Amino acid sequence: MGKKGKGIKPVVDNRRARYEYHIKENLEAGLVLVGTEVKSLRMGKANLRDAYAVVKDGEIWVNNFHISPYDKGNQFNHDPLRPKKLLLHRREINRLYALQREKGLTLIPLKIYFKEGRAKMDLAVAVGKKLYDKREDIASRDAWRDMERSLKERNRA
């Protein structure tokens, strides 16, 4: 028998976060989950859309991270919106606490994945974009797409 792959298996991605925030830095954190949450997460039944992280009492907690109840779970199923604890080193938590206290900075989850069988969260320190920033991003993306299209047409001829 061959070995099981020990790579990274992405489960949930918060694509909206990259549109609504300027990402300053990323870091990886472990997740503290109960059994039915892990099973439901492996099936991809989670939502990061409104999730955010806060530093409280020297620990980092993720709020509004929805993991659907496990279909085959019984009365011991989990609460879908239960705050989840993140596992980080003390110095990282202290640094994030200092960053979180700065005006305009927030901690948002970007994606959830399994790495060597353990649930991990890609956490970002971010600043919210203004409406005109979003419009600039859309305009630059459209300009890039038009340029690529014209280059492709020129190469065909």
UniProtKB/Swiss-Prot annotation:
HAMAP family: SmpB. Keywords: Cytoplasm, RNA-binding. The keyword Transmembrane helix does not apply. It comes from Syntrophomonas wolfei subsp. wolfei (strain DSM 2245B / Goettingen). It is found in: Cytoplasm. NCBIfam families: PRK05422.1 (NF003843), smpB (TIGR00086). The keyword Cytoplasm applies. GO terms for cellular component: cytosol. It comes from the Bacteria. Belongs to the SmpB family. GO terms for molecular function: RNA binding. Transmembrane segments: none annotated. Required for rescue of stalled ribosomes mediated by trans-translation. Binds to transfer-messenger RNA (tmRNA), required for stable association of tmRNA with ribosomes. tmRNA and SmpB together mimic tRNA shape, replacing the anticodon stem-loop with SmpB. tmRNA is encoded by the ssrA gene; the 2 termini fold to resemble tRNA(Ala) and it encodes a 'tag peptide', a short internal open reading frame. During trans-translation Ala-aminoacylated tmRNA acts like a tRNA, entering the A-site of stalled ribosomes, displacing the stalled mRNA. Its main location: cytoplasm. The gene is smpB. This is SsrA-binding protein. InterPro entries: SmpB (IPR023620), SsrA-bd_prot (IPR000037), SsrA-bd_prot_CS (IPR020081). GO terms for biological process: trans-translation.
